[in-house]
Amino acid sequence: MRVMGIDPGSKCTGCGVIDEVNSELKVVYWGSIKTKPRQSFPERLKFIYDELVAVIKEFNPDEIAVEDMFFATNVKSALKLGQTRGVAILSAVNEGKPVAEYSPLEVKQSVVGYGRAEKQQVQDMVTTLLRLKEKPETFDASDALAIAICHIHAATANLKIKTAKGT
């Protein structure tokens, strides 16, 4: 199974692609989509959309996992994040890919074992789990890889449950 994880952000959106074969995880790609501060917000959304579609077309993931919204105290930031998430989900759906969503707590719990882990802890664990020679250049990229790992763990658990039930 090939999974693409997306960590949406209007300034920097992380994306990562991981293959899972015979319970082994192998990183295929990771990167950050950085928008320009002078771009209007709609231009940023279009840029993020176009870049995500290009990654989807290049690496052809079977499924895409997107980080769900966290609690935000700033309404304007929450709205922008929601719109950026919408663009990420739309890029997947328009390319015919199924989408799963996970909260930051679920991702951290799955990857680090602690739902309130710091970004550095997530990055360190992603680097270890994927046996990377170097850490991803941004927390957005390592978070995206963590989201993909979380989805692989969830999909594997769901498959085991279905197999045990005989469905």
Residue ranges and their predicted role:
Residues M1-T167:
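Phosphate- and other anionic-substrate recognition elements at nucleic-acid/protein interfaces
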